[in-house]
C-alpha cells in the first residue's frame, strides 16, 4: 500500500514537472508563477503545493531529470563505442552534451540566464555543476583520462556558452555544421591537460 502511494506521488510530481516545463518554455522561468503551473496541470492548489513549494523546486527536479536522461545517453554511447580512442569518446560525450537539441536543453539555457538574478538558482547551478562535473570526471577516469578535466572551469564555461548560444543566438545550425571543430577543441584541451598533469 505504501509503495503504491509512493508510485502515485512520483507520477503526480512528474506530471507537475511536465506542466511546469511547458510553462517555463512558453513564458520563461522568471515569468512563470505557481498559479500558471496549477492552471496548466488542472490540479488543485493543495495538490500541487503538496509536492512542490515553488517553481524553483520544480526547475531543480527538471534539471535533475535532464542529468538522468543525459547519463542514460552516455551509458548507451559507451556500450556501443568501446573501440574508439578515449579522447574521441570523451569528445563525443561532451560535444553531444553541448549540442543536444531537446526541451530540457532549452530549459537549461533559460536557467543559465535566470540564475544571474536569483540567488536560489545560482545555488542550484553550483550544486548541479558539482554533481555533473563529478559524474563526467568519473567517466573520464574510467576511459583512462588521468587529468581532472574540469579543474579550471574552461570546459564547463565552453559547454554552457555553446548551449546558450544555440538557444539565444540561434547558432545551433552553425554549430552542427562545424561540430568537428568544437569536438577537436575539447579533445585538444584534454590532451594538453594530460601532458601538463
Residue ranges of predicted features:
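Short, basic, alpha-helical segments at the C-terminal edge of helix-turn-helix-like DNA-binding modules
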Residues: 64-70
Amino acid at each position: 500500500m505504501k509503495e503504491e502511494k509512493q508510485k502515485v506521488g512520483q507520477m503526480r510530481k512528474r506530471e507537475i514537472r511536465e506542466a511546469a516545463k511547458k510553462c517555463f518554455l512558453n513564458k520563461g522561468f522568471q515569468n512563470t508563477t505557481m498559479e500558471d503551473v496549477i492552471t496548466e496541470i488542472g490540479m488543485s492548489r493543495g495538490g500541487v503545493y503538496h509536492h512542490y513549494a515553488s517553481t524553483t523546486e520544480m526547475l531543480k527536479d527538471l534539471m535533475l531529470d535532464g542529468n538522468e536522461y543525459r547519463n542514460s545517453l552516455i551509458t548507451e554511447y559507451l556500450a556501443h563505442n568501446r573501440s574508439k580512442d578515449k579522447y574521441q569518446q570523451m569528445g563525443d560525450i561532451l560535444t553531444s552534451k553541448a549540442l543536444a537539441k531537446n526541451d530540457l536543453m532549452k530549459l537549461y539555457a533559460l536557467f543559465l540566464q535566470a540564475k544571474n538574478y536569483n540567488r536560489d538558482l545560482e545555488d542550484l547551478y553550483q550544486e548541479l555543476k558539482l554533481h555533473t562535473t563529478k559524474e563526467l570526471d568519473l567517466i573520464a577516469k574510467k576511459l583512462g583520462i588521468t587529468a581532472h578535466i574540469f579543474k579550471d572551469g574552461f570546459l564547463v564555461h565552453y559547454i554552457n556558452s555553446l548551449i546558450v548560444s544555440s538557444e539565444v543566438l540561434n547558432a545551433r545550425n552553425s554549430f552542427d555544421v562545424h561540430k568537428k571543430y568544437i569536438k577537436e577543441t575539447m579533445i585538444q584541451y584534454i590532451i594538453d591537460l594530460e601532458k601538463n598533469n
